[in-house]
């Protein structure tokens, strides 16, 4: 693999170049790893072929026939040694295959591009070119971009008109021009609109959220308006409206509560008003059961029957329209008190029960439990 693509910054990391060493010497370091160190005495010039053109007698790139450009580059130079100021038409100069004459190949789009000094896309770079050596340099640059730096989709290169080009394009000036264009291509930022989705950085996803920004703004505006309106009109926050606004249930709809707390040592029963004020609160110890006698099923059953009888004495069975039974713990008194409510003792309270809930406390982690008691 020639290089590893970093999708966050779209740059080459740990790349192994396949370009000539003299061209690699002029490239800037890319990514977080620098290019390998090369000898500094290597001059920069386009790669030359073994045989020069029979007309212009210059050794140039089109004679090499690279593998990637084999259907495009011919064996001899097609420039016909035109004068320096002659506008070149690449679509007429190069003989393209039949399947690539419809403009699909990048080289066919360079013939009618407008002349300008502004930065432009690579596909509109070759409006007019100087003769053979500069053309070799530009073609080499195009091959470098397409073959080895394919993650840059539309590199922008600043070109200049032919009037400011040197009169004689030597190998040294051609190399400097190629290096300058190459540096500008990698120094300019690659905008998200010019890159595919898979090369965008994760920090450039704001454009995808623009579609929902209007609805989010409307939601925030309505929420702010409601809060400001409540603060501006304090009369709405009094009385029953306050309970409605903060989500509290009306106390008139709250039922009475019949709490049964049973653990392995005792059983507690508490009857409360809707506002949580206690009416009756008794345990097995209040009935005369001492020590270990408080944990048995019979003591809990007697406690339940006593509490129900006391509720009848207080005429609570006529006052209570709604009652909630709240169970807590898994001791033997749990089933005993339920038997009382379902039996003959609780026949006058059974019809007022509207809800049965369990309030047993469960630890998720929590404090450390007591060590188990072991006898013997």
Swiss-Prot record:
A cellular component annotation (GO) from this entry: mitochondrial small ribosomal subunit
Top-level taxon of the source organism: Eukaryota
Predominant subcellular localization, coarse grouping: mitochondrion
Localization (cell): Mitochondrion
rRNA processing listed as a keyword: no
Keywords: Mitochondrion, Ribonucleoprotein, Ribosomal protein
Single Gene Ontology BP annotation: translation
MF terms (GO), sorted A to Z: structural constituent of ribosome
Family indicated by similarity: Belongs to the universal ribosomal protein uS11 family.
Subunit structure: Component of the mitochondrial small ribosomal subunit (mt-SSU). Mature N.crassa 74S mitochondrial ribosomes consist of a small (37S) and a large (54S) subunit. The 37S small subunit contains a 16S ribosomal RNA (16S mt-rRNA) and 32 different proteins. The 54S large subunit contains a 23S rRNA (23S mt-rRNA) and 42 different proteins.
Role of this protein: Component of the mitochondrial ribosome (mitoribosome), a dedicated translation machinery responsible for the synthesis of mitochondrial genome-encoded proteins, including at least some of the essential transmembrane subunits of the mitochondrial respiratory chain. The mitoribosomes are attached to the mitochondrial inner membrane and translation products are cotranslationally integrated into the membrane.
UniProt name for this protein: Small ribosomal subunit protein uS11m
Organism: Neurospora crassa (strain ATCC 24698 / 74-OR23-1A / CBS 708.71 / DSM 1257 / FGSC 987)
């Amino acid at each position: 693999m020639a290089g590893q693509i970093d999708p966050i910054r779209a740059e080459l990391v740990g790349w192994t170049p396949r370009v000539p060493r003299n061209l690699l010497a002029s490239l800037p370091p890319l990514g977080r790893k620098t290019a390998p160190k090369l000898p500094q005495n290597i001059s920069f010039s386009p790669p030359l072929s073994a045989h020069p053109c029979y007309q212009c007698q210059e050794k140039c790139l089109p004679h090499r026939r690279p593998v990637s450009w084999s259907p495009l580059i011919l064996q001899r130079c097609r420039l016909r040694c035109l004068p320096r100021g002659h506008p070149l038409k690449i679509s007429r100069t190069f003989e393209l295959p039949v399947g690539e004459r419809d403009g699909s190949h990048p080289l066919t789009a360079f013939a009618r591009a407008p002349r300008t000094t502004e930065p432009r896309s690579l596909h509109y770079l070759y409006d007019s070119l100087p003769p053979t050596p500069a053309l070799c340099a530009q073609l080499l640059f195009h091959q470098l971009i397409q073959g080895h730096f394919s993650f840059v989709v539309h590199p922008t290169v600043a070109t200049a008109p032919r009037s400011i080009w040197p009169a004689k394009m030597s190998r040294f000036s051609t190399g400097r021009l190629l290096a300058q264009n190459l540096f500008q291509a990698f120094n300019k930022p690659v905008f998200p609109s010019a890159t595919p989705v898979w090369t965008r950085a994760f920090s450039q996803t704001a454009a995808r959220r623009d579609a929902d920004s209007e609805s989010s703004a409307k939601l925030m505006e309505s929420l702010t308006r409601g809060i400001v309106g409540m603060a501006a009109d304090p009369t709405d926050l009094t009385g029953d409206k306050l309970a409605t606004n903060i989500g509290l249930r009306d106390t008139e709809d709250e039922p009475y509560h019949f709490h049964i707390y049973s653990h392995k040592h005792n059983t507690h029963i508490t009857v409360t008003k809707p506002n949580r004020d206690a009416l009756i609160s008794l345990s097995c110890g209040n009935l005369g059961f001492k020590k270990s006698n408080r944990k048995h099923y019979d003591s809990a059953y007697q406690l339940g029957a006593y509490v129900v009888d006391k509720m009848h004495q207080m005429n609570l069975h006529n006052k209570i329209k709604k009652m909630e039974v709240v169970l807590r713990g898994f001791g033997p008194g749990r089933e005993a008190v339920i038997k009382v409510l379902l039996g003959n003792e609780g026949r006058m309270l059974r019809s007022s029960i509207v809800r049965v809930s369990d309030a047993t406390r469960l630890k998720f982690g929590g404090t450390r439990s007591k060590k188990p008691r072991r006898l013997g």
